[in-house]
């Protein structure tokens, strides 16, 4: 919502197309005539389309209108879901128990609606065995396929191989 809407005397146009509070068009009127109509109804004259020829003004209760707009904005902010990206790190030769523990954490993240970045970190000479890292990520993808979908396939970036998994309910 624009904070600086022109209301009543702040409207500079000489002629305006007037719409009443019910949405009915009252035609093209002079600014003063439109202001007089608004004041007799104890309402405000609000410029809603300044770029139209002639500009469009509406007769309404401006305070109530601003309150409604603020309420709508607040509701829209509440409905926005912030999606976090959680990272789970593996090594190419990870043990079964360690893998299960990290898998359990990743499943929790996906259930909460967060994206999961699964990364395999290669240290030292392990970088020569990239296929081991791919096997770990493939196994991870297989284990979480009921909760998430693969957003990016496994790829190398520096000494890390990673993939992104998004929760399934986000796609629907």
Curated annotation (Swiss-Prot):
Keywords: Cytoplasm, Initiation factor, Protein biosynthesis. One of its GO terms (molecular function) is ribosome binding. GO terms for cellular component: cytosol; membrane. GO terms for biological process: ribosome disassembly. InterPro entries: T_IF-3_C_sf (IPR036788), T_IF-3_N_sf (IPR036787), Translation_initiation_fac3_CS (IPR019813), Translation_initiation_fac_3 (IPR001288), Translation_initiation_fac_3_C (IPR019815), Translation_initiation_fac_3_N (IPR019814). It holds the Pfam family IF3_C. It is found in: Cytoplasm. Monomer. IF-3 binds to the 30S ribosomal subunit and shifts the equilibrium between 70S ribosomes and their 50S and 30S subunits in favor of the free subunits, thus enhancing the availability of 30S subunits on which protein synthesis initiation begins. NCBIfam families: infC (TIGR00168). Belongs to the IF-3 family. HAMAP family: IF_3 (MF_00080). This is Translation initiation factor IF-3. It comes from Oceanobacillus iheyensis (strain DSM 14371 / CIP 107618 / JCM 11309 / KCTC 3954 / HTE831).
